[in-house]
């Protein structure tokens, strides 16, 4: 398995060996500087040496075996920077620099072991590294499963002198590290982490460095595995890229006096949480904006204990990178109970629109088969997004929003909702089997509500299409 999975990383590296001179991304360079290739998260290149005609002629130049670093899932997108390839691997989230010509390991860095890192549910989910050039020196930034931010010299892998603050744990470097838990404002033990009865937080996506500001998202316990309704909010943190000093914190669950606080009834804002940003971030450096795609509030399929729309759950938030002030936001799903969290970074592009000319846009692809499109400066939808009635819940104590936002354009890219007419009918026998297989399930529209055991319909469960996996 290790060989197969690491090959996904390494074949990309091998292609970069041959064609790196033609890699051009949105920053106007020949490099791949961020997880998405560029700040706009286009994951695209203007390179034209690889074509449909010559693709079959590509050969593997080398392979790098990540098994020695505990690589299992292989979720990382390598970065190509200043002639080196940077990636992360394994449950320990090693940071590794490779020679793209030979595949040889130049250096590696591993954070010392801690219980808070060991029990991280997203330990092997590392997606990549952050990068910035600070005062002429390349710096690699990494967020560990234990939720530490480390700054490393891109040439040597040595923690940056003068960055961060000492961590009171044996084995940690005395410089180069920031304990991110310290800035969330909850009691915790530096070694053990947050008490499990308080909540859980970690990270899988790398930080994004915009105009010398490190912006840190986070990940909570997976909503479909949550065992408690108590949790901590996944607040967005930002740090000075030179010193590691905290610059600002944005509360993803609004506190008293903040915009949106009234969307949390039952005082749930005090003791529940999530609304994290496990998906990557994107940014518009010219306009000092970072775009945050958020997760649902705690527990994916039931929210009776948190009545209200629950801002900023299942939203896109545009923040000023300098201050953390909210420029605008849009909530895709009110009081989310379908696992319809935003699963990927917003994509930035400029659209030529009739009567409007070139419009700076941001697009959020979602699990519910819609692409939400906005003016990225003002937050105005580029096409109408209308509130339409949706079914109510029959689950005791659950009060869903009576309406949900519906995108009118672009058209959905996949089926939304499911009826008996959508079932397979290749032959009469296949159709009969399909109907029988789903007889105990409640079919319905896109926002078909979850149901509970022993419900009055006699159905075993409700079906969602698309489901929580998109």
Question: What are these model-derived regions, one by one?
Answer:
Residues 46, 51, 282-286, 438-442:
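Conserved oxyanion/phosphate-binding beta-strand-loop segments in alpha/beta enzyme cores
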Residues 235, 392-423:
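A surface-exposed, glycine/aromatic-enriched loop/edge motif typical of exported proteins
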Residues 32-36, 71-94, 120-148, 199-228, ...:
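Repeat-blade elements of multi-bladed beta-propeller folds
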Residues 11-22:
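Bacterial N-terminal signal peptides
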Residues 53-67, 95-119, 135-136, 149-197, ...:
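Extracytoplasmic/lumenal domain signature
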Residues 27-69, 80:
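Mature N-terminal segment immediately following signal peptide/propeptide cleavage
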Residues 86, 359, 412-470:
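PEST-like low-complexity, intrinsically disordered acidic/proline/serine-rich tracts
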